[in-house]
Amino acid sequence: MRFVPAVCLALLASLSFAAQARMVQRPVEWTLDGTQFKSVLVYDDASHAKRPGLVMVPNWYGINGTAIKKAEMIAGKDYVILLTDMYGENTRPQPGHADQAKAATAPLYTNRAVMRKRIDEALAQLKAQAANAPIDTSKLAAIGFCFGGTAVLDLARSGADVAAVVSFHGGLGTDDPALAKNIKARVLAMNGADDKGTMPDADKFMDEMRGSSADWQFVVLGNAVHCFTETEENSPGCKYDPRAAARSYRLMHDWLHAAFSGTP
């Protein structure tokens, strides 16, 4: 009689193990204007339930192990994330080599139309993944960090049909403030109060948003500098701040939930 409980316990353990999260990392490739891009689709395949899809643009170092871990953390059981390659598969700045990252981002900062075209294409590619990933295409959004924050704000300015965009310590400036009239998404921008790189553009950004019909929020996180969500950064002007990071992630989840559910 003691054998039966043992078998039951073993069966329950095996079922529990099978139900555990398994984060999928699947390459997604496309060509745009002669450049080959290689992004990564990230999601938990323990469940086949459809969930919102997010375009995620990492910081200026682009796709690397740290960015993938962050995408997995955010995706959890809640989202399917397309971690987006904005440079092309042959351009991969090495972490810590700011000169390489600066060279990679320069053409996109110089020509914002190209930046918008590339992230618009990333959104189209995310939608296409619904054929073989559990994406609810009625619930799409974009999030970005540092350079990626700039990119997702430009996605909103392009008039993309997404429910929301969320920018973490992203650049706030634009080449054309009039584009704000195109915004359909709810816009959440979060920046550190002591971020010397982005905060000088804060007033212009708010004026830009006021001149649009967008539903927007601009959150200033006290005592935080640039890079406050970037766990590997620890320099005076670009430093991880666990308190600001945790608060910003809570704000992100709340913003996305409200946007997807149509609540204020």
Range-by-range predicted roles:
Residues P27-I135, T229-N234:
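Serine-hydrolase catalytic machinery in alpha/beta-hydrolase-like enzymes
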Residues K70, M199-M209:
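Short alpha-helix in the alpha/beta-hydrolase fold that links the catalytic acid
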Residues G144-G148, V152:
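Gly/Ala-rich beta-loop-alpha elbow adjacent to hydrolase catalytic centers
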Residues D161-G171:
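A conserved short beta-strand
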Residues I183, A189-N191:
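Short beta-strand/loop motif that positions the catalytic acidic residue
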Residues D194-T198:
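Acidic catalytic loop of the alpha/beta-hydrolase fold
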Residues R210, D215-P264:
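C-terminal catalytic histidine-bearing segment of alpha/beta-hydrolase fold enzymes
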